[in-house]
C-alpha cells in the first residue's frame, strides 16, 4: 500500500474503491383484476468493488493497450450476496408474495338469530394458516351482505370476520385456481349475553341409507372450519339425536364414529335459542375405492325437497348415456351397478346420496341439484338460502365440499368430472332452466 501511495503522488498508479446500496425493480399492472393491481418486484442490496484507478498511468495503460481492467467485485446483485433483500409491492404496500391469481371467493354474511344480511361487515384475508400474518386483502360486505374477492392464488387462507355489535370469529378456506369458491353463509352472533347459553340439536344419519345412527364421539372447537385446534368440549352421543348447550358463538362440531368417515360441521349458537344442525356420516366402504365417487347432498329445513341429478355423457358423441334421479334411481349395465341414487329425501335436510360404482374413462359426469319444491319458479332464491352443501368422497376421504352460491335459481350445476384425467371441475352455476 505504501508503494501505491507513492505512485499515486505522481499519478502513476492508484487504488480506487466504491461501496453503497443498490436498488432495482420491475412493475406489472394486472389489468384483469377487478381493481387494477400494480405489482412490483424489488431488490435492495449492498455493493462493493475496488481496483486500479482508471485515471492513472497504469490504469490507462491496462485499459487502452492491454484492454484489461483490474477490478474486484466484492459484493454484487447476485445469489452470493448476504446483504440482499427481495420484496413484493402491490399498490404501494409490501406483501409476502404476489396475490394475483385466478381464484375467487364469494359469500354472504348474515345475523345468526334472524338470518338478516349484514352490510359493512369487514373481512380480512390472510395468506396461510396463521391469522394476523401476511394480510392479503381487506374487504367489506355490500348493502345486501354479499362480498366477493377475486385474483387469489391457490392455497390456504385464514379469514377474520367482524361487524359492529357482533362477535368476531375466524375460519380457513381453500382456494383453487380457475374456480370460484362459495363460502357457506357466515353467521354472526350478537355480543349481548356472552355468559348465557344457546342450544343446538339435530339428527344423526347414515349417508348411504338415510337411517338413524348412534353411539359416536363429538368434539367442539372454537371458530369455523377448525378441524385441528384445541378441543373445548368432548363427549358422546348415545342416541340418534343430540342436543348441546353452549355459550353463544361460532364453533366447529366434529363427529367421529367407528367404520364411518369423520365429518365436521359449522354451528352458530344463539343466546336462548335452539338451532337445528343435522349430521350425516358416510360409511367407510371398501366398494367405494379411490377410483369411484360418492356424492352427498344436505341442506336446511327449506325448501323441503332438493333433488340430486347425475348425468353420464359419452365424450365422443356428447350424448347422454344415463341420468340418475328420483324417477330413475339405478343405472345398470347387465348385472353390474354403474350408478345409484342411494337415498332420496323429500322432507328437508337430506341426506340425498348418489354413488358412481363403476367409472368409465370414455364418459364425462355432471352433477346437478334441482329445487323440486320451487320447480316451476323463474325467480326463486330459496335454494340459495337453504344452506345446501355437496360433499364428494373417494375412498375414505372427503375431497371436495361445495356450498350453494348465493344467487337465484332452481338448478345448481355443481361440478363436472372426467375420470380419464381424474379432473373434477367446479362449475357452481345457478339457473332457472337445465
Language model: regions and residue ranges:
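Short Pro-Gly-centered beta-turn/loop motif in secreted/extracellular proteins
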Residues: 30-38, 146-156, 164, 238-252, ...
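A short, amphipathic beta-strand motif
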Residues: 103-111, 184, 198-206, 293-297
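Extracellular beta-sheet/turn segments enriched in Thr/Pro/Gly and aliphatic residues
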Residues: 86-100, 173-195, 268-289, 409-417
Amino acid at each position: 500500500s505504501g508503494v501505491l501511495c507513492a505512485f499515486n503522488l505522481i499519478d502513476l498508479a492508484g487504488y480506487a474503491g466504491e461501496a453503497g446500496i443498490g436498488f432495482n425493480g420491475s412493475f406489472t399492472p394486472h389489468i384483469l383484476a377487478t381493481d387494477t393491481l400494480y405489482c412490483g418486484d424489488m431488490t435492495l442490496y449492498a455493493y462493493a468493488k475496488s481496483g486500479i484507478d482508471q485515471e492513472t498511468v497504469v490504469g490507462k495503460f491496462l485499459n487502452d493497450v492491454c484492454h484489461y481492467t483490474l477490478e474486484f467485485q466484492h459484493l454484487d446483485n447476485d445469489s452470493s450476496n448476504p446483504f440482499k433483500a427481495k420484496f413484493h409491492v402491490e399498490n404501494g404496500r409490501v406483501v409476502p408474495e404476489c396475490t394475483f391469481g385466478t381464484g375467487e371467493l364469494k359469500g354472504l354474511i348474515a345475523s345468526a338469530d334472524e338470518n338478516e344480511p349484514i352490510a359493512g361487515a369487514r373481512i380480512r384475508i390472510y395468506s396461510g394458516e396463521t391469522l394476523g400474518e401476511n394480510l392479503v386483502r381487506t374487504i367489506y360486505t355490500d348493502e345486501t351482505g354479499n362480498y366477493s374477492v377475486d385474483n387469489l392464488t391457490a392455497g390456504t387462507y385464514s379469514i377474520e370476520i367482524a361487524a359492529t355489535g357482533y362477535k368476531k370469529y375466524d375460519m380457513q378456506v381453500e382456494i383453487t385456481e380457475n374456480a370460484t369458491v362459495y363460502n357457506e353463509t357466515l353467521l354472526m352472533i350478537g355480543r349481548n349475553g356472552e355468559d348465557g347459553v344457546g342450544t343446538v340439536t339435530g339428527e344423526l344419519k347414515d349417508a348411504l341409507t338415510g337411517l338413524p345412527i348412534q353411539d359416536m364421539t363429538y368434539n367442539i372447537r372454537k371458530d369455523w372450519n377448525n378441524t385441528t385446534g384445541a378441543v373445548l368440549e368432548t363427549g358422546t352421543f348415545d342416541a340418534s339425536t343430540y342436543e348441546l348447550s353452549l355459550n353463544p358463538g361460532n364453533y366447529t362440531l366434529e363427529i367421529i364414529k367407528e367404520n364411518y368417515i369423520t365429518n365436521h360441521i359449522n354451528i352458530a349458537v344463539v343466546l336462548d335459542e335452539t338451532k337445528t344442525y343435522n349430521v350425516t356420516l358416510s360409511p367407510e366402504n371398501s366398494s367405494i375405492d379411490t377410483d369411484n365417487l360418492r356424492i352427498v347432498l344436505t341442506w336446511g329445513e327449506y325448501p323441503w325437497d332438493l333433488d340430486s341429478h347425475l348425468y353420464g355423457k359419452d365424450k365422443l358423441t356428447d350424448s347422454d348415456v344415463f341420468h340418475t334421479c328420483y324417477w330413475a334411481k339405478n343405472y345398470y349395465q347387465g348385472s353390474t351397478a354403474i350408478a345409484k341414487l342411494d337415498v332420496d329425501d323429500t322432507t328437508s335436510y337430506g341426506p340425498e346420496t348418489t354413488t358412481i360404482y363403476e367409472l368409465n374413462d370414455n364418459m364425462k359426469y355432471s352433477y346437478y341439484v334441482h329445487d323440486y319444491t320451487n320447480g316451476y319458479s323463474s325467480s326463486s332464491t330459496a335454494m340459495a338460502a337453504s344452506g345446501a352443501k355437496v360433499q364428494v368422497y373417494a375412498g375414505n376421504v372427503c375431497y371436495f365440499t361445495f356450498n350453494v352460491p348465493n344467487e337465484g335459481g332452481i338448478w345448481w350445476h355443481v361440478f363436472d368430472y372426467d375420470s380419464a384425467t381424474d379432473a373434477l371441475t367446479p362449475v357452481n352455476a345457478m339457473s332457472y332452466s337445465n
